[in-house]
């Protein structure tokens, strides 16, 4: 069974943290800078990419000490708007890749907490591929059921 994650904004460090639910005492947070818009260098992705956590459908950068590419990208505070409908997140992320206004940090936090991880872990929806492509992530998924081509998935 796949682990569940909780998503919390840490205003003191200005990061969005991901933690396994029910593992607060033993799990380290996965966090990413809210101001970083570029994908990390290959060295930012550790060789032990956390497959032991059984997190279905997350790319290897989710276990980077710098945090997941898409969360770092989609949490940039300097690109804010009132858009809050989670159904159009891929379009919102595409606008961000073009440097246009997009979803607010609060809306993104709610989306990741209430929708995205539920879709990934409970429903296995393929929207995760599109989210990470448009969010600037080019890392492979961990425990993906079949080979996937990010560039044709979007």
From Swiss-Prot:
Which organism was this protein described from?
Hepatitis B virus genotype D subtype ayw (isolate France/Tiollais/1979) (HBV-D)
Binding partners and assembly: May form homodimer. May interact with host CEBPA, CFLAR, CREB1, DDB1, E4F1, HBXIP, HSPD1/HSP60, NFKBIA, POLR2E and SMAD4. Interacts with host SMC5-SMC6 complex and induces its degradation. Interacts with host TRPC4AP; leading to prevent ubiquitination of TRPC4AP. Interacts with host PLSCR1; this interaction promotes ubiquitination and degradation of HBx and impairs HBx-mediated cell proliferation.
Disulfide bond annotation, renumbered to this chain: none
Resulting phenotype, residue 95 to E: No effect on interaction with human DDB1
Say if the entry is tagged with keyword Transcription regulation. yes
The UniProt similarity line reads: Belongs to the orthohepadnavirus protein X family.
Q: Spell out the subcellular localization from the entry.
A: Host cytoplasm; Host nucleus; Host mitochondrion
Tell me what this protein is called: Protein X
Any single biological process term in GO: symbiont-mediated activation of host NF-kappaB cascade
Q: Which UniProt keywords apply?
A: Activation of host NF-kappa-B by virus, Activator, Apoptosis, Host cytoplasm, Host G2/M cell cycle arrest by virus, Host mitochondrion, Host nucleus, Host-virus interaction, Modulation of host cell cycle by virus, Transcription, Transcription regulation
For this chain, the Swiss-Prot or TrEMBL PTM comment says: A fraction may be phosphorylated in insect cells and HepG2 cells, a human hepatoblastoma cell line. Phosphorylated in vitro by host protein kinase C or mitogen-activated protein kinase. N-acetylated in insect cells.
Q: Tell me what happens on changing residue 46 to S.
A: In strain: Latvia
**Role, per record:** Multifunctional protein that plays a role in silencing host antiviral defenses and promoting viral transcription. Does not seem to be essential for HBV infection. May be directly involved in development of cirrhosis and liver cancer (hepatocellular carcinoma). Most of cytosolic activities involve modulation of cytosolic calcium. The effect on apoptosis is controversial depending on the cell types in which the studies have been conducted. May induce apoptosis by localizing in mitochondria and causing loss of mitochondrial membrane potential.
Please give the residue ranges the record annotates as the region Mitochondrial targeting sequence.
68-117
- The reply on keyword Metal-binding is no
Q: Which InterPro entries match?
A: Transactivation_prot_X
Name one cellular component (GO) term.
host cell mitochondrion
């Amino acid at each position: 069974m796949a682990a569940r994650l909780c998503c919390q904004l840490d205003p003191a460090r200005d990061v969005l943290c991901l933690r396994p639910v029910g593992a607060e005492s033993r799990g380290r947070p996965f966090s990413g800078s809210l101001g970083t818009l570029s994908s990390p260098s290959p060295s930012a992705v550790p060789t032990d990419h956390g497959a032991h956590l059984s997190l279905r459908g997350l790319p290897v950068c989710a276990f980077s000490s710098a945090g997941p590419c898409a969360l770092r990208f989609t949490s940039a505070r300097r690109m804010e708007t009132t858009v809050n409908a989670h159904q159009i997140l891929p379009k919102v992320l595409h606008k961000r890749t073009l440097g246009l206004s997009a979803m607010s940090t609060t809306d993104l936090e709610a989306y990741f907490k209430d929708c995205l991880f539920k879709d990934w872990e409970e429903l296995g929806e393929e929207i995760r591929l599109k989210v990470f492509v448009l969010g600037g992530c080019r890392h492979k998924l961990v425990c993906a059921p079949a080979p996937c081509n990010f560039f044709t998935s979007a």
